[in-house]
Amino acid sequence: VPVGALVATAAALAIMIALAVVSVRRVCREPVAALLRSVPPRRGSVRLGVLEAMLVAAAAAAFIALVTGSVGGAIGQIAPTLLALAVGVIAARVLSAGLAAAGQRLLLAGRATSGAALLTASRRGTTRWLVPVVTIALCIVVVTADSLAVGARNWSDRAAAEVGAATVLTLDSADLSAVTQAVRSADPTGAHVTPVAILHPTGQDATTTIGVVPASFGRIALWPGIDTASLPWDKLTAPTTPALVVTGSQISYHVVVPAVKVVGPAIRPAPTSLALALRVVRPDGSLESVPLGTIPATGIDADQTVGVSCAEGCRINGIGILAPSGAAAVSGTVTLTQLAMDGRALDLGGAPSWRAPAAVPAGATPSGGAEVTAAFADGSVTLTFDNNGADKAFLAHASVPDVVAAFTTPVSTPSASAATFGGSYVDGSALLLGSVGRVAFVPGGPAAASIVNLDNLLAQGWRGRGSAELAAYLDSADPDVIATVTTALQANGIDVVATRHAAVLATAYGETAAAWSLKLALAVGILAVLVAGVGIVVLASTARRARSRDYAALRLVGQGSRGLALLAQLETAPVVVISALLGAAVGWWAAPSAVSMMPLFPTPSATFPLDVHPASAAALVAGLGGLLALTLVGVATSHAVARHADLQQLREAG
């Protein structure tokens, strides 16, 4: 063989080997992740396209306008959807880059199937459509579930707040004392029934006084959204001094009175006589001043006997002096000894049994009202008085409330700290109140209401007028329980004129036009899942040919059916799950803004504040249900694509 031929052959062989090396050198230098593709690789950038950026900006601007109140009403309810749209478009870009990075790490770790699946998912165009579809759907599901649960909660809570208890019996009696005794006979421990007095004011801007038994009212009344255990019930006090009750028809005593003094310039005529008097509460609760004898202005030292109408018992409310109307102001002292009722010694008690006038702080100006003080000794009492021109000057018994502690609603709370304000007894007479705590509302009461201890209202004036409403609150709607209580009340001469149930009113609220429009959210949520499911199927069908061809190639190189099915499912399931979780999070965050714009009631409540905080349980269950449903759809469609991947796909492609 000629040497030239050998050289030519060797040269040709070397050139062919060099060409082969050069041709595969670039491919060999590429990472495995870059070779696993059936389409040209996309850039790993998360930058948005022009149309995507415009869409995100418009959706974000609309959402901000909605939640800031620039737009409201029915249009405002789409705020979560707009936010989900913006988040979904951005997430589609970010998720593609994230899937690519995760796939590369899995390949480097030797997990070929899962790594290849994530890389393929990051490169498929359908992923960019799948993410916003699922994100919006799950956002709608969570918002609709939350709105339904929040609506149902508010229907129930508003009914509870407006009715006041599970069952409220309105009674035909205006006698609070009789009602209290009848209720206690029906339930001596107050475990299930409690009396309530609702005393509406005569003035439009005044507060409604609501008398309750604190221990049982806090337990039996319905307080949606309020932690009753945190309320300072111990501050709703009533006088602890026992009432001073006398029975008889004649009072006798010895009285010593020096000449009274006219106080200040005598612009008005000086009185020629005064009268010692008792202020008593009659058995019907009415308040009356009973004169006990005349006291000449020049003084007296004598025994006195006077008839009184207390055969059925009188509760002594105060002791003091009566003066003629329009007379000059006078002051003096009255000393009583040998005080007796029908010949029996009458003990007025000591100083602790009577309420001393409020002390005037140093440097402060006296109030200028009538003032009576008392000094007690064995068998005698000395009254020192200055009537300041008033026709009545009494020292009050300690069993009579002074400034009554009250829980007040925001409307009834005075603006000045520690200020007093006017309430009323059952008969409409004035009762001085002071706020010791605030409540958002009073169960069964109006917007301007004050809760007081019922015992204060039983001190006097316990027989009501037309605007006084006496009721019994029950902790049960059981007909047998209601019948038992009604029978016990009737046995005491008290009939039930009306019965209200919180559950019945809640049902009525749930059947209003506003409620039915809200209930349509259930159909919207279901429809959102169906549309998203159809979207997953359509996107899978769009990419089915390319995916089947890829899977057929893998089958050709020895990949088994189970491996192909797993790879196909891993392409779709992570995208669906991540998008669903993202949509649920968006819905959870945006739901309160949307629900606050939804009309839950035909008319707003004057007392109950709406509670739109998210309903955690309902939103979680709905979100998990939507996530499971869409994941199953994605897995099923991917499995179907993998099952149809056979070598025929490669022949068709060739």
Give residue spans per PLM region.
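Alpha-helical transmembrane segments, especially those used as permease/efflux helices
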Residues: 1-29, 33, 37-147, 572, ...
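Selective detector of the "anchor" transmembrane alpha-helix that sits immediately C-terminal
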Residues: 10-14, 519-542, 578, 623-631
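Interfacial "coupling" helices/loops that link adjacent transmembrane helices in transporter permeases
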Residues: 30, 35-40, 534-576, 649-653
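Peri-transmembrane interface segments
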Residues: 71-79, 484-532, 543-545
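Juxtamembrane segments of multi-pass membrane proteins
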Residues: 71-72, 77-241
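Basic-flanked hydrophobic alpha-helices used for secretion and membrane insertion
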Residues: 180, 193, 198-202, 206-500
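Juxtamembrane/transmembrane-helix interface segments of polytopic membrane transporters
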Residues: 579, 583, 587-600
